[in-house]
Every structure is written in C-alpha cells, then in structure tokens.
Amino acid sequence: MRREMPYTAGLGERYGYATGYRATSHPSLPNYLAMSGGSTFGVTDDHDPSAHPLAAQSVFGQALAAHRTATVYAEDMPGPCFTTSAGRYAVRHNPWTYYVRERAACRRHDLPMTGLSADVRAGRLPNAGMVVPNTCSDAHDCPAATADAWLRTVLGEVMAGPDFTSGRLLVVVTADEDDHDQGNFVLTTLVNPQLHHVVVSSPLDHYSLARLYAEVLGVPPLQQARSAPSIVSAFGLVVGPGH
C-alpha cells in the first residue's frame, strides 16, 4: 500500500492509522450496512435496495433525529438517493439508500458529490457524513494509484476548508473489504489535527465506525456498535456535540 498509495500512507503516518482494523464480511454491501447501521442485517450479497428494504435506523437518520446534520456525497450518482447502479455509481456502496423508513430524508441529504466542494468552502460539512467514490476512484475497477490521486484531490480540498482547519472535522479513510487475501484487514487512516503519528494495533472494525458516528453525535450506538471497540478511545480523541 505504501508503494501504490503514497499520499494515503503519508496521511496515516502524519496523523494516525489502525493496523488491526478488519472489515466484517464479504462482499461489499454488508460492510457498508455495518458502518451505517451497526449490523449486516443478515445481508450476504450486493443486491439493490429493492431486494433489501431495511426497516431500521441508520447513523444518518439518527443524526437528523437528534437535530444534527447528515449528508452522503456519492460520486457520479445520477440523482439524490439513487437506488440502482448506473455507470460507475454502485448503489451497494451507498448504504443510506437501503433504509426505507428514512427514504424521504435520503432524498434530501444523499446527494451527488458535485455539491461537496461548496459545502467544504462554506464550512457546512455535516455532523455525520460519508463520501462515496465511484468504482474507479475507489480502486475497485482502477489501480490503487488512481484512488490515491483521487484522495489527494478530495482530501486536499477538505483539509483546506474551515471545518478541518478549525479542528472540528475528523476524516476516516477506510475500505469496505479486502481482496480476499489479507484476512479482511483494511486500510484505515484517521485525519484530524488532534492526531500526531498515532498507530493503533488494537482490534477495530466497521461496527467501531458505526460507534464512532454515535460518539461524535452524542447518541446511543446502534445494534452491534454498542459493544464494538471504540475508535475514540483507541486513538485518544476528544469528540462529541461540544467539540
């Protein structure tokens, strides 16, 4: 990874990264559900939302219910909360579209990535957010170097914005799953001005990421995130509604 993704590796060395972070399963979709809902909900495939209408709460819906903000930015998505794949947009990588009780909120706040730059410049990035690259930018269909260049562009802009420079924004860079060759360990880097050369070897997973959303929002963790190891504790972060 250091050779193929030097920018991303450098971020981890400058701020922090986890060496013991695992995905929860294969294929992609169950991992995104674990991140966003604290459970795989028994899903074992990558089918569209029409096959898996989840009557559960997501971290994004939980944020809105707590009067906080939530936005998903999906690269190349044809329209808000788009529930089928199109071109390089893969709906299996956009988990909010599966939570059918939150579909109205999804249509308002699950948006094409074209709106990200304006929100960065205005300092209005959400309390609970996710950026979903297309299947080239995420290295699924293109080399890892392509993903590294994409991250350099996107994170360079985000890290120059007021949400990050003020210390309010924590960025987590992770992957849904490994290539079936690494024990499902996945690259996970944390970027925030609080962090300086932090390396965490303790076990973490996508349920830990769902718990992180809850800890940032100041709300109870969902499903299996309740018992997941805490990223906040592991990295020594200070988070919550007052931070």
Regions found by a protein language model. Give the residues of each.
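Flexible, surface-exposed loop/gating regions in the mature catalytic domains
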Residues: 1-243
